[in-house]
Amino acid sequence: MDWLLFRNICLLILFMVVLGVNSEFIVEVKELDIENGTTTWQTVRRQKREWIKFAAACREGEDNSKRNPIARIRSDCEVSQRITYRISGAGIDRPPYGVFTINPRTGEINITSVVDREITPLFLIHCRALNSRGEDLERPLELRVKVMDVNDNPPVFTQNVYTANIEENSDANALVVKLSATDADEDNHLNSKIAYKIISQEPAGAPMFMVNRYTGEVRTMSNFLDREQHSMYNLLVRGSDRDGATDGLSSECDCRIKILDVNDNFPILEKTSYSASIEENCLSSELIRLQAIDLDEEGTDNWLAQYSILSGNDGNWFEIQTDPKTNEGILKLVKMLDYEQEPNIYLSIGVRNQAEFHHSVASQFQMHSTPVRIQVINVREGPTFRPSSMTFSLRGGMRGDSLMNYVLGTYTAIDMDTGSPATNVRYVIGHDAGSWLKVDSRTGEIQFSREFDTKSKYITDGMYAAEILAIDDGSGRTATGTICIEVPDANDYCPVIYAESRSVCTHASSVRIYVNDHSFGAPFTFCVVDESPDTADIWDIRSINGTSAILMTEQTLSPGPYQIPILVKDSHNRACELPQTVLLDACLCDDYHVCLHSSTTGIYTGDTIWVTDDMGTVTDDGLRQSNVGLGPAGIGMIILGLLLLFLSPLLLLMCCCKRRQPEGLGTRFAPVPEGGEGVMQPWRIEGAHPEDRDVSNICVPMTASNTQDRIDSSEIYTNTYAGGGTVEGGVSGVELNTGVGTAAGIAAGGATGTLRKRSSTIGTLREYQDTGMNMAFLDSYFSEKAYAYADEDEGRPANDCLLIYDHEGTGSPVGSIGCCSWIVDDLDESYMETLDPKFRTLAEICLDTEIEPFPSHQACIPISTDLPLLGPNYFVNESSGMTLSEAEFQAEMAAASEPMIHGDIIVTETYTATDPCVQPTTIVFDSQLPPNVVVTETVMAPVYDVQGNICVPAEIANTHNVYYAERVVASPGVPDMGNGNIGDTCIGPVMSGGILVGPEIQVTQMMSPDIHISQTTRSTSPMTSQHRVTRYSNIHYSRQ
């Protein structure tokens, strides 16, 4: 470790060199600024060239001249030249002036006057060394002269008198007040350390308070404070510096503590019992006064008493209140007493305070009862009204003399001594707001003195009130009673009834009647008046609800008119003066209860008959008409009917006859058959029920054309069902449906001109429920499914490793089971080359190579590419016997669109799993076509045998972001594929040679009812899987 020691020595030498080069150290110290009361950081510089002598300390309030010179400054430069020393700062050229002086030659600094630390605790002197030209030879020096503190300031309290409050019975050590004193001497020094002490307490006695020596907090010594004994304490507190030493300075202050009252004393009554007397039938506002004694502070809620009657006041004759000035309880008589009933009454009075009792004594309180005897004096009593008020009812409809002669009733007074009606009394009406009443002075009979208005303001809620007085002739005593009169409302309109039916049958006589009243509402009461003999016996009336009833009879009537008098009463049991007569006409009726002749029904009231004619109008002798008529709703319905009658010919003119179009593709809904492949069947395999069938692969020659079609389209869609190919003289599994929204173009073997209709170029059957499974389709199906599973395994790196099985202790009975875990063993893989097609996919997975399929035994028919521009258009109908029809037409050449700016190109290859002998067609981009083209290549060959190329025109060279994808489309030979849909949109015409040209072509994938084919990209579906994406920066154009 010698190198470590050597390193430390080198670092120490380097540090010393740096220290020698630097000329000074700066040290910061904390200094208090007395003038503005702030603390600042000052710097003390230690010079390498020592040219000062530290100043001596100075004591305040003393003559420090005997210590002169208190400091001396000297520079090394004085050896070579003459130096003048100068000083400046506080005490020199700033207040206080003239405290320090300096010898400019020797540099001695002297103090010349007495200093005060409380004014200037520190003097900062700036020293300079000047040459003869007045230039600084040294850096200016700061000289600090500290003034030493002397205990020359006594403590000073912030207040001369402190005032505090505290409740009596407070807990011990409760804070009362905090005293505060300051000392001008140096902080954090013994001269400024103050100690507090209680010197005296008034009133004298046991000390009740103590003070904290250092904080000045005054607290209680115990919980014995009692306001009833002493309500005020005066304390004399002294504060001494030097921590209370005898040589310290001190000052004193007064502390006045007021004891607050709490409700800790229970009130008691001055006497143990009370008594009083009063005459019967008299009231008293001050029957007796009860004095309560309470030691708490007067005028407060702790002192005010709250009186209560505990018992004896069964008739609520007495009340007791508190006089807040004297704290007395005033007993009042609020109801008259009866000597005959209660000659003596004994009360129990209790008292407590209005404020709650203090928690220290609340549990000890018990209310004590004080007895009070009330003696009732018997006197000769005057008359009185029993009951004190009486209600009378007035019959409605009374006017004039009948009202004046009507007697409401008699209201007389009784003699309380005897209990019989009073004799020597006279009656007069007292308060009568409307002056409507009069009374017989001897009998007390009450009558009306004038007519009155039932709508008068003196009538409240149908009730009129007045007073009656009974005056004793002997004693002059007066009794007062109240008269209440129920005034009925004027019934200006009688309840009017009317019948529902105008005629009744003789064998089933019943009619419904209704009541209408303007003044009073339901319920109404109905009764038949027996004016003529046996009227009430024949007719019976029953109420249905509050406003209607049914009039009926159980007897068989004779044909002819009938008059039934009916009396109707309202809810106040009032009715019209005369009963109302209902006129009915009994007639012979047929089986449908219809009268054989018309009749007239009316209502007879006295001399007036209200008749209802056939038109429903009620007349009063032909003069008055009722309010029955045609309303706005009826008029509106009539007008609406007339309008509909006039508009019906116009509506018939708008109707047109249309022929029913023949049913075609998509005109009816084809339900999924019961054996559809979209449903799992009992045989637990995908597809139709397995059948042993010999299905040969059909490969027929196809016709193609190199003619390029150009079309400008805005809304074009194409659906393609591809199976085996297009044949000459026959059709096998190809269907092309092209729909053009707005397009014009040329097609060989198809429709020409402006294509706006949906046409079927080549069609065949799409349902193959009775055919077998296409082995080529299964081959492609499982191959693509295996590729999809391989793609998923590539996305799972955690499973991409060799798995070693754990040894479980015993060997396997099958010895070769362990070899399957090592794929690196040498295996003879040559036998996999001769496997059947159904095992070819498994072999390709194991060998990681693509096995060439066996050559087809069927000869490949060459595709003819020399097709004329004008050719036949073949249509194949779906039937067992194929019928071919031929049509020729001349197409019109459409103008080519202008090339667009080069952009991205998406090229999509869609392969159809079918016979491997068909070669893929070629996509050719014409030079007139713009970029941004999506191209779909449809190949009638298995996926693994496709060997084509993509040709791109020259004008889209150097184009980036070319998207290339492969999709597998199921063959129509697969069962239940006829119900599937192929593609949503395909823009551009389909040529017979398989060439697709268009400004923007997009083909979507084939949709199939098969659940595996309908899976999305990157899933386990073998029919729709995306394999590779290649980006081309340069695409060469070639034509084949």
From Swiss-Prot:
GO cellular component: desmosome; plasma membrane
Reported consequences of knocking out the gene: Knockout rats show an increase in skin leukocyte population with higher CD3(+) T-cell counts. Knockout rats treated with topical imiquimod develop significant skin erythema, thicker skin, erosions, mild scabs, scaling, dermal neovascularization, vascular branching and vessel enlargement. Severe hyperkeratosis, parakeratosis, intense hydropic degeneration of basal cells, marked vascular proliferation and thickening of the epidermis. Increased exocytosis of lymphocytes and neutrophils into the epidermis and slight mononuclear infiltrate in the dermis.
Localization, UniProt: Cell membrane; Cell junction, Desmosome
Chain positions carrying an annotated carbohydrate: 110, 545
Signal sequence region: 1-23
Chain spans, region Disordered: 1015-1040
Membrane-side (Extracellular) residue stretches: 50-633
Domain Cadherin stretches: 50-157, 158-269, 270-385, 389-497
Alphabetical list of Pfam families matching this protein: CADH_Y-type_LIR (PF01049), Cadherin (PF00028)
Record key words, sorted: Calcium, Cell adhesion, Cell junction, Cell membrane, Cleavage on pair of basic residues, Disease variant, Glycoprotein, Membrane, Metal-binding, Repeat, Signal, Transmembrane, Transmembrane helix
Parts of the chain that traverse the membrane: 634-654
Domain of life: Eukaryota
Keyword Glycoprotein appears in the UniProt entry: yes
Ranges: Desmoglein repeat repeats: 883-909, 910-940
Chain residues in the propeptide: 24-49
GO molecular function, one term: calcium ion binding
Recorded topology in the membrane: Single-pass type I membrane protein
Topological domains annotated Cytoplasmic: 655-1040
GO biological process: BMP signaling pathway; cell adhesion; cell-cell adhesion; hair follicle development; homophilic cell adhesion via plasma membrane adhesion molecules; keratinocyte differentiation
Assembly, per entry: Interacts with JUP.
UniProt comment concerning the protein's domains: Three calcium ions are usually bound at the interface of each cadherin domain and rigidify the connections, imparting a strong curvature to the full-length ectodomain.
Job description of the protein: A component of desmosome cell-cell junctions which are required for positive regulation of cellular adhesion. Coordinates the transition from proliferation to differentiation in hair follicle keratinocytes. Plays a role in moderating lymphocyte migration to inflamed skin and maintaining homeostasis of the epidermal inflammatory response.
Illness association: Defects in Dsg4 are the cause of an autosomal recessive phenotype lanceolate hair (lah). Lah rat pups develop only a few short hairs on the head and neck which form a lance head at the tip and disappear within one month. Hair regrows again a few days later, following a 29-day cycle of external growth and loss. Almost complete pelage hair loss occurs by 18 month.
Name of protein: Desmoglein-4
Lineage, highest ranks first: Eukaryota, Metazoa, Chordata, Craniata, Vertebrata
